[in-house]
């Protein structure tokens, strides 16, 4: 499939659905930043930057002016991306996923570099000096080509006459808060009118990409949209330009509940999970990185923005203070030193074989701090309390959950449990982080109250860790009652349960119908029990608190290159 045949909006919709767990209602935060910019930014200087960005040639002084203005805007905003270099290793992502990511980032690097190099025969959009420009003009004139083409079809090539082109990186791109502030302050509009206009444009964006024709029609109802330029988009356009693409990005933030990609927030704790999900959506839809220079397709766009920084708002936040490009700030490590593969202690033993690394313990503490110690907290384990293989804690009011696995000591008992209960396979637990379950239990808040379906095993597990202060409420559902919502939960949340891939044999008691063949997943069971008790499946999206990398040993020996 060529880049011209990309079903762009379908890809966007698929990414919206697949990444809905990471989208947020951001309207209030965007408007708070917009008000801060209106109140404190010198719009005389903004006008000078806008004028400078209309020039065909720009100097070192122009770049300094742009960077200084970007720094002021960044200081005024709460929604920003921070410098965060990401090194992805085998564990949270498989070997194949890491190699796929590395390949796509390299393809994206080549595409971006070709695009910034012009992408048109005979046209260079990079950083020629004034003397080089004059020399080129003379050579082309001598060859009978006049002054040569000044730009690609539909736009003008803007040339920066600067020594260090790396200073241009991350200084462009629009921010909704800045767009709204400029429309309000420079257009002499009420911010509420701007918000209403962008909301109307955003409703169009839920079903199609708004175009200039749509903009013109909406202008009849919302005159402030006349402030949006009718010029086609160009590369390296300033965030201070009121382009249609800037308006579309801003209007996405006005639509709560639309799962807009623009409202994605990336945190270090869930970076691996997000990348894994993006790759899953990509493969399901047949997305790809196109070699053709030009505008990025939806997959290329999200890959670049998310990999640029692992901490912040990749689409709508300020990123002018980030150094480097996406392929520099997110790297893949396929050559980690193999970990020592200790044989498991058979037939029992403590669940805590070794101390968890300090960095991972800190991640656990940060995750637990996000739990509400007074909120309803469901708990479930798979495996016996002396040799658990899975633990889940789930708070239905917020959707926050902790979910981890553990390699068992008693492999024979584990295989029997797999066939008749959880469907976990030993090979999938080989590189799970030892000590993680114990670490979680140790750091749970004092006197916390947990809710469970059957509390005997949970109480035994807590007592093994000296946590007699934690109480466990038993809802005491019958086996049939407990699994009333099973199919509904599996239909909606099966993507949360990726390791229970083994075959489960239905249990059949005399005089009773055969039991379920669905594997017992601790996390999905927590969601299922809550849905059974409340009588409905909540709309609150589950949110992982533990990063995927925390669940696996460092430098797991899964690849040998």
UniProtKB/Swiss-Prot annotation:
It is an enzyme of class 3 (hydrolase). Mn(2+) binds at residues 380, 382, 525. Residues 53-237 are annotated as: Binding site for the cap structure m7GTP. Coiled coil: none annotated. Its main location: virion. Gene3D superfamilies: Arenaviral nucleoprotein, C-terminal domain (3.30.420.410), Arenavirus nucleocapsid protein, head domain (1.10.150.550). InterPro entries: Nucleocapsid_arenaviridae, Nucleocapsid_C_arenaviridae, Nucleocapsid_C_sf, Nucleocapsid_N_arenaviridae. Pfam families: Arena_ncap_C, Arena_nucleocap. Keywords: Capsid protein, Helical capsid protein, Host cytoplasm, Host-virus interaction, Hydrolase, Inhibition of host IKBKE by virus, Inhibition of host innate immune response by virus, Inhibition of host RLR pathway by virus, Interferon antiviral system evasion, Manganese, Metal-binding, Ribonucleoprotein, RNA-binding, Viral immunoevasion, Viral nucleoprotein, Virion, Zinc. GO terms for biological process: negative stranded viral RNA replication; RNA-templated viral transcription; symbiont-mediated suppression of host cytoplasmic pattern recognition receptor signaling pathway via inhibition of IKBKE activity. It is found in: Virion; Host cytoplasm. One of its GO terms (cellular component) is host cell cytoplasm. The record marks 457 as: Important for exonuclease activity. Its EC number is 3.1.13.-. Zn(2+) binds at residues 390, 497, 500, 521. One of its GO terms (molecular function) is RNA binding. Encapsidates the genome, protecting it from nucleases. The encapsidated genomic RNA is termed the nucleocapsid (NC). Serves as template for viral transcription and replication. The increased presence of protein N in host cell does not seem to trigger the switch from transcription to replication as observed in other negative strain RNA viruses. The N-terminal region is important for the cap-binding activity while the C-terminal region contains the 3'-5' exoribonuclease activity. A CCHE zinc binding site is present in the C-terminal region and may thus contribute to the substrate binding and/or the specificity of the exonuclease activity. Belongs to the arenaviridae nucleocapsid protein family. Homomultimerizes to form the nucleocapsid. Binds to viral genomic RNA. Interacts with glycoprotein G2. Interacts with protein Z; this interaction probably directs the encapsidated genome to budding sites. Interacts with protein L; this interaction does not interfere with Z-L interaction. Interacts with host IKBKE (via Protein kinase domain); the interaction inhibits IKBKE kinase activity. This is Nucleoprotein. The gene is N.
């Amino acid at each position: 499939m060529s880049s011209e045949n990309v079903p762009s909006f379908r890809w966007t919709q698929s990414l919206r659905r697949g990444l809905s767990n990471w989208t947020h209602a951001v309207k209030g935060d965007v408007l708070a930043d917009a008000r801060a910019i209106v109140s404190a930014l010198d719009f005389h200087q903004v006008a000078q930057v806008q004028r400078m960005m209309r020039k065909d040639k720009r100097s070192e002084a122009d770049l300094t002016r742009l960077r200084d203005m970007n720094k002021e805007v960044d200081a005024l905003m709460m929604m920003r991306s921070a410098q965060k270099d990401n090194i992805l290793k085998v564990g949270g992502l498989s070997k194949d996923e890491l190699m796929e990511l590395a390949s796509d980032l390299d393809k994206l690097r080549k595409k971006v570099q070709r695009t910034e190099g012009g992408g048109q025969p005979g046209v260079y959009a990079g950083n020629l000096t004034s003397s080089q420009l004059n020399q080129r003009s003379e050579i082309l004139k001598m060859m009978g080509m006049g002054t040569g083409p000044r730009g690609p079809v539909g736009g003008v090539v803007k040339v920066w006459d600067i020594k260090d082109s790396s200073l241009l990186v991350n200084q462009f791109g629009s921010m909704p808060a800045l767009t709204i502030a400029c429309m309000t302050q420079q257009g002499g509009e009420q911010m509420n009118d701007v918000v209403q206009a962008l909301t109307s444009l955003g409703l169009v964006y839920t079903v199609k990409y708004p175009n200039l024709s749509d903009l013109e029609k909406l202008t009849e109802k919302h005159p402030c949209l006349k402030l949006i330029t009718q010029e086609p988009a160009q590369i390296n356009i300033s965030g201070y330009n009121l382009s249609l693409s800037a308006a579309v990005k801003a209007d996405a933030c006005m639509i709560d509940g639309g799962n807009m990609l623009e409202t994605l927030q990336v945190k270090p704790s869930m970076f691996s999970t997000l990348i894994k999900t993006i790759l899953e959506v990509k493969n399901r839809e047949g997305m790809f990185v196109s070699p053709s220079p030009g505008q990025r397709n939806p997959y290329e766009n999200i890959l670049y923005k998310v990999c640029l920084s692992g901490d912040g708002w990749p689409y709508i936040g300020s990123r002018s203070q980030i150094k480097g490009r996406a392929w520099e700030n997110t790297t893949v490590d396929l050559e980690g030193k193999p970990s020592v593969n200790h044989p498991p202690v058979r037939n029992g033993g403590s669940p805590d074989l070794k101390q968890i690394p300090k960095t991972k313990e800190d991640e656990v503490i940060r995750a637990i701090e996000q739990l509400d110690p007074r909120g309803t907290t469901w708990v479930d384990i798979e495996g016996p309390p002396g040799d658990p293989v899975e633990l889940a804690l789930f708070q239905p009011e917020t959707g926050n959950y902790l979910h981890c696995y553990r390699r068992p000591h008693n492999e024979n008992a584990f295989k029997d449990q797999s066939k008749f209960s959880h469907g976990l396979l030993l090979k999938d637990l080989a590189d799970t982080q030892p000590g993680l379950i114990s670490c979680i239990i140790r750091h749970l808040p004092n006197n916390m109250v947990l809710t469970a379906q059957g509390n005997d095993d949970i109480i035994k597990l807590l007592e093994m860790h000296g946590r007699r202060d934690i109480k466990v409420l038993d809802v005491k559902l019958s086996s049939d009652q407990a699994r009333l919502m099973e199919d509904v939960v599996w239909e909606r949340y099966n993507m949360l349960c990726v390791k229970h891939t083994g075959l489960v044999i239905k249990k059949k008691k005399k005089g009773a119908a055969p039991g379920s063949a669905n594997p017992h997943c601790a996390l999905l069971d927590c969601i299922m029990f809550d849905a059974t008790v409340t009588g409905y499946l909540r709309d609150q999206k589950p949110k992982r608190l533990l990063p995927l990398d925390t669940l696996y040993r460092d430098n797991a020996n899964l690849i040998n290159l």
